[in-house]
Every structure is written in C-alpha cells, then in structure tokens.
C-alpha cells in the first residue's frame, strides 16, 4: 500500500472516555521516571529531535506514554502502536489519543488488527508524510518497513531496538546483509538489560501470576526456563515469594550462576511433572512442548515472560486439546489433557503485560531514557554510522544511571585526580572499560 492509498485515521483506541483516568496515571508515573523528566528539562530549548517523525511500536502502557510525550517535548512528531496484542493499557492509549497523538492500540488485538495498527504508524498527519525514524520493540515494525515498504527505507535515518528478540533479528539481518539503516541496540545497554530485564521482572513476574490466578506462591514449586537477565529476575521474584524454584538452562555459564545463586538446575523433562508453575524466559522457541504438557499434573500454571508466544507450543496445545479450552477470565484459559487441567496465562504471550501492568515506572525510566538518547544520537549523527548494530557509548550508559540516583537518595564518592590516574579513568568517567561485565 502506498501513501496515497492509505487513508488518514487520527487514532484508534478502545475507549477515548478513559483519557482522564489515563492522564492521572501518567502524571503519577512522571514522578517515578526521573531520567525522562531530566531529559525534558535538559533539552527543552535545544529541541534535538525537531524534524524527526518517529514511528514507535512498543507496549502502549502508562510508562510508554511518558516516553512518547518526552520525544514530543524534544521536538519530534510521533505515531504509536503496541508490539503485543495484550499489553496495551487502554487508559494510556486514550490519554495519548486525547493529546492529539496518532496512536493505534487496544488490549486484545487480533492478528490482522495488530498489523493494521503498525501500518498506520508509517505515515504522519493528513498530508501523509512518511516516518524517518523507528523506535521498535521486537522488530515487527522494522520488518514491516523493510519487507513491505522498502521505498520508505531511504528516508529513515535509523532505528533503536528495545528487546532481546528484536536485537537478535537485527543481528540476523546484519549477517545476511539486509539491514538497510544504522541501528542502536538499546537492550544491551547496562542500564537496560541489568535493570529492566532483571529488576523489572523481579517485581512484575510474581505480580502477573498473582493477579491472574490468586494462587498462594509460598511453598509452590516453580520451574523457570532460562537464566539470562530475565530469568535471573524471574527466579528471584518467585524465591522472594517463598516458592521453591528450579532453573533449566542450556548455557553452562548461566547454569553455574543459577547453581551458585542457590537454585537447583535440572532438565525440564525431569521436573515438569512435579511443577506447580512453569514460566519461560528464554527468547527461544519450542521450550515447553506437547510431551511436557502430557507430563504435567492437574492445575499446573504455564506462562511466558519472553517477547513472543512461541516459547510455549500453543499450536500443539490448540490443535490437540483446543476443544477443551475454557476461558476462566480474560488471559486465563483452562485446557484439559487426559483429565488434568492446565492453566495457560496470556495465551503464552508476555504474562507480565498480558495479566498485569508490566514493570514499575522507575525501572522503565532507565530503559526509556536509553531509547530517547538513542533516538537523539541517530537523528543528529546518522551519517557517522554504517548499516550495522551499535551500542550507546559507556558515558551515556553512566549518564542514564546518574539521572536516577537522586530519586533513591544515592550519594556518589568523587575520585581525586591521582586516584583517577591510578586506575586510568577520567574523574568524571567513564569509570569502566567497554569490556567490563556488570
């Protein structure tokens, strides 16, 4: 579809009357997002994103609304869709629409609507100007532009990617020689992956399961599939609730970390039959298969906190046992296998946004401050980059962390000149080499 044949739709949300509620929650979130608010204050006069038309595809939550309005405060025009069919908070989408921003998102999208919403973000206003920047989470927007709208690519200065799955897709494109613009990998900034992925999941994983099921977690046997940053936060989340946690892993380093953090590390086949809750965190496909479902005990809860729904073999489950499916409530479904009930949360999609409201505002401020800095960097300096995947430099990573310290009452020591010289760093940083692993 070309610009000329795509009609202008100002917005599409579930219920615009929710805007006042959403605005109150946005104002509350702003107080917990010091990084974004600091960037608004720092750049309000400079307007570093003036002229940028940023199409965003990222969970349309209250916290994302603060990001959107930060990008606009820095001079950008913005359109938005959600990267997950269940993750939109309808009051947030309504508030953004009421502010005159093109947003296309509501909770409970079907797949055709999901694609339609992304497509609407490619063109701006009634004059249908095309996007010139991408802000993505998972790669669906990026892939749509490159694969279905290649004529738009030349006008795009760059893209920033939020999550592990999307970054993996970008590196696949680099390897295949099909990435046509520079990209910044926001996910692997220290202040994203070690905070959003870990500390965010530490709070939101348990929150989602509790809201969905009202189950008592203390004493329950939980299997966490994967022990990367998301898995680490998820395992800690359930252990903090008193659950007995077992981890599964393919990576010997992550497996050793899990063991030395005090978790048993076992093969899924050996523990699936005794688990009360199984949660996937890997970013890979086909983790929980039909053979695993057949071993599960009655009332096992199965969910996923990775980006896509293919970590759990929902296709097998629906093909073989779909006739038994009963919706308990939205995003909580019961399947019956050989007389045993299995509870699936959020249809195998991202459980913390499908069954709850995702990560807390403060930790999302870390991630979204990185996103904002990445957009500024690519918009102002895209000519300095090749068609490859880049990281934000260390000094910006440290800046993101610094902007969040005062909110927590943190006081930093200051290096003397001789101390800085002794360890080979500047008095004002960066304080660690690029290869340092936090």
Curated annotation (Swiss-Prot):
The keyword NAD applies. SUPFAM superfamilies: Formate/glycerate dehydrogenase catalytic domain-like (SSF52283), NAD(P)-binding Rossmann-fold domains (SSF51735). GO terms for cellular component: cytosol. Its cofactor is NAD(+). Its main location: cytoplasm. It catalyses: S-adenosyl-L-homocysteine + H2O = L-homocysteine + adenosine. It comes from the Bacteria. Pathway: Amino-acid biosynthesis; L-homocysteine biosynthesis; L-homocysteine from S-adenosyl-L-homocysteine: step 1/1. It is found in: Cytoplasm. One of its GO terms (biological process) is L-homocysteine biosynthetic process. NAD(+) binds at residues 163-165, 197, 226-231, 249, 284, 305-307, 352. Substrate binds at residues 61, 137, 162, 192, 196. HAMAP family: AdoHcyase. May play a key role in the regulation of the intracellular concentration of adenosylhomocysteine. Belongs to the adenosylhomocysteinase family. This is Adenosylhomocysteinase. It comes from Flavobacterium psychrophilum (strain ATCC 49511 / DSM 21280 / CIP 103535 / JIP02/86). The lineage of its organism: Bacteria, Pseudomonadati, Bacteroidota, Flavobacteriia, Flavobacteriales.
